[in-house]
Regions:
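Structural preference for solvent-exposed beta-strand-turn elements
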Residues: 1-344
Length: 344
């Protein structure tokens, strides 16, 4: 039997990004009486308040009889003798929180663009907080490095769909690390390790908590990727021209071919093309590389992130058209990107 209920819209909208599509208990939102909980066991959203106990669909805002749900699912999902939804709620004793300002929010959103989307590369799927206060993200081809929170603990967080929404709409956000004891495989000793990232946030006067498991595994040695120096530096070309070229390339090139060729015609002109398609000859003062190559090839999708989505670009540095380029932004952030390798 379904009974219609009115529940907080912000919570239910966010919950749709967490609940599973599988036929298990975690496709529902649970009201324990004093809080609403949505979870898939890896990430959990909580809003405290007084709500009628039961299991609810975040899409239909409907309640199902609790006994029906309990009989079918409850015992299968018990953990440490706790109800399945209670066991996913992280309590915040000894968690120190750091306020997230608009600048850090924006940097986390930019960093997410640089993360790997390959399921086999989980160690590159997150945004890394370095011990020196840097925020770093890479997929192996492009990397973003920016100043973060100097005192924040070392960890790697997964920037999920719901976290992106929270970063966009929350009026206040703070985040902290939840630690847990874990056995060291080499020494067999109990050690304290970071396990979860917790975000407390407000939308208007409503208060929420979102938590997610941290990504485990060693993040790549990002410092080794940054070139010590670049022999050539150029200012970026007009962003509006780039947007027109990028839009045209999306329409005219096959999906499997993302490359754009930049051919230096003379000291002030570059032709941008792909095979038989010539998109434009633009004014851009860029010199051939140290080996006198005059053709540079870049993945258009990567270049679009570098040119239009990472902040105000003020400098592009390079030495060799087959090696890493550096992109420097007005706020001090940098990006490192590998051009596409071409046969000479």
């Amino acid at each position: 039997m379904l009974i219609q209920n009115n529940f907080p819209k912000d919570f239910m909208d966010l919950a749709q990004n967490i609940v599973t599509k599988k036929a298990n208990i975690f496709r529902f939102v649970c009201s324990t009486g004093d809080k609403l909980v949505a979870t898939n066991t890896n990430e959990t959203l909580v809003q405290y308040g007084n709500y009628k106990e039961g299991f609810y669909s975040p899409k239909e805002s409907a309640v199902l009889q609790k006994l029906y749900i309990e009989n079918e699912f409850k015992d299968s999902y018990k953990k440490d003798d706790k109800e399945p939804f209670e066991s996913c709620v992280l309590y915040q004793k000894n968690v120190f929180f750091y306020k997230i300002n608009d600048s850090i929010r924006n940097k986390i959103k930019i960093a997410e663009l640089y993360t790997s989307k390959d399921p086999a590369r989980e160690f590159m799927q997150g945004v890394f907080f370095d011990k020196e206060g840097k925020i770093v993200a890479t997929d192996g081809r492009i990397m973003y490095v920016t100043n973060g929170i100097p005192e924040f603990p070392v960890c790697q967080i997964k920037v999920t769909k719901i976290l992106l929404k929270i970063l966009d709409i929350a009026d206040y956000i703070e985040m902290g690390i939840k630690y847990a004891n874990s056995k060291n495989k080499e020494t067999n000793q109990e050690v304290r390790v970071a396990k979860y990232i917790i975000f407390n946030f407000k939308i208007g006067t409503s208060e929420f908590t979102y938590s997610c498991k941290l990504i485990e595994g060693k993040f790549p040695n990002w410092k080794a990727v940054i070139p010590e120096k670049q022999d050539f530096h150029v200012v970026p070309f007009d962003k509006k021209i780039w947007k027109d070229i990028y839009s045209a390339s999306k329409k005219l090139q096959p999906r499997y071919d993302k490359n754009l060729y930049f051919t230096i015609e003379d000291s002030n002109h570059v032709t941008i093309s792909n095979d038989d398609i010539v998109y434009a000859t633009i004014e851009w003062s860029i010199e051939p590389d140290i080996n006198k190559r005059n053709v540079l090839v870049f993945n258009a999708d990567y270049l679009n992130i570098l040119l239009t989505k990472s902040g105000e670009l003020i400098d592009i540095g390079y030495t060799n058209f087959l090696r890493a380029f550096t992109f420097t932004y007005k706020d001090g952030s940098i990006a490192v990107a590998m051009p596409t390798q071409i046969k000479e």
